[in-house]
């Protein structure tokens, strides 16, 4: 079937099971071929082909609402709703988004990039439906570990209490990104082997009613014996106790079983949870055999061999630099523990996990818990290293404020994927952390200019005992610089002059330092002398350095790959104002006040005007012509 000709899912209504099976093969082939060129979340989508087709066949989207959680499972949904022809642009600038996007299609009713939000949103939609007295199904599809998130459990509790009509699809592939962890995962494991409790209960009631004379009376007591029955037949009754009708487990690749179960769910009042067992990566051997999450989300790859197409790496990944330095220090300090919220592979903690399994803690998709747990460990003299993506640290803001900073606890937060991350887009750009951490009392915030300085700042963080400290580091690789053998502590709040200059100064840090250095060199050739400063401590700032610089009364430009509002540049402006430098000219470059879409980092930087050319132009506008050398 030519998938690019699909306009909407209505064509599925008339298809037989054998035709649907052929469509499944076509979709898997399409995904494998297309994603080999663009990269993307291949394994999660190969696992939900039959489930997605079954949902679109039995329900009526967009009247009926599908909410995908996590949203990277929505590729098949996008194909069935008329977007196959755009897959060549997947996750590229102004191309097809890798997550549901409301502006893309009326079938995308909810946007998800972070996990565990679908049930709360679905509850809101269902309550709105009931208040408006309309009739549509609300169907959140939750999987890839999203059910372990605290927000999802809060929603389950409320939905079950209110008995709201809703069909929750639990897509259980036994993995999130890496293998699932936690007691809830164990509950699901028992349910997978428990058989179909509800089918048995209904059969028993039917048989009881057939008994002459007493059958009706006996059947009337069925509800009273329901608890005993479910404990007899099901080893895990978690969802029933929360107030849901539990259906399953059902084979998520068997159309007959899916149709039977979903039709039953449609006729059931109150909240229903359909437990669907799927195989992550189904139909592509390299993805099927993956047990650690390598094929969860990928770049381009070679279909036949399963080898990834990667540019030759001349420098280590930032995540590896940080995690391996932590590991090196952990070998001589038993107090060091590593904590991750379901991202051991992305944060490059596999080596730490292998060497110190009892000191490596993966809490699952539970950022709030991970953060406060780290705080608890710090109260007992441990040295927790919390490795967390910038975008996911947003979810633990209150815990950072209330539990870490307020108590001034020695927690080292490794803020991975800081700055623009590219293809994952606006839900994942790590551009807000400076603004929401800089204003917190007791917090120290750093970002290195290169991987050598990065390892020294990790050492600095582990030696620091006066409160919380955080290190920002980017997605991708370092610069390939020489790495010192011996680690050293860098004085807290100290900046570094990278290039001397007399007519203007650029204050920056991290990934924008190469941009600043190149701009300064070009300006030097044009007769403009510009100082470049490595402001590696975003907080506290080097106040002595700032006093000296502001006292020279030369234009200052701050550059940051982070949002301008409340950012580093704002801090410099505040310092100048509060210390009486009212004639100082301080201008800022950074991320504007909007969400940044998906695309390559280079393209996105061009789009927002954060380039070497833009820096050169800005400095020229800041320096009066009469001050420029010929």
Swiss-Prot record:
It is an enzyme of class 2 (transferase). SMART domains: Transket_pyr. Keywords: Isoprene biosynthesis, Magnesium, Metal-binding, Thiamine biosynthesis, Thiamine pyrophosphate, Transferase. One of its GO terms (molecular function) is 1-deoxy-D-xylulose-5-phosphate synthase activity. Binds 1 Mg(2+) ion per subunit. Binds 1 thiamine pyrophosphate per subunit. Its cofactor is Mg(2+); thiamine diphosphate. The keyword Metal-binding applies. GO terms for biological process: 1-deoxy-D-xylulose 5-phosphate biosynthetic process; isopentenyl diphosphate biosynthetic process, methylerythritol 4-phosphate pathway; terpenoid biosynthetic process; thiamine biosynthetic process. CDD domains: TPP_DXS (cd02007), TPP_PYR_DXS_TK_like (cd07033). Pathway: Metabolic intermediate biosynthesis; 1-deoxy-D-xylulose 5-phosphate biosynthesis; 1-deoxy-D-xylulose 5-phosphate from D-glyceraldehyde 3-phosphate and pyruvate: step 1/1. Thiamine diphosphate binds at residues 72, 113-115, 145-146, 173, 284, 367. InterPro entries: Dxylulose-5-P_synthase, THDP-binding, Transketo_C/PFOR_II, Transketolase-like_Pyr-bd, Transketolase_BS, Transketolase_C, Transketolase_CS. Gene3D superfamilies: 3.40.50.920, 3.40.50.970. NCBIfam families: dxs, PRK05444.2-2. Homodimer. This is 1-deoxy-D-xylulose-5-phosphate synthase. It comes from Bacillus cereus (strain AH187).
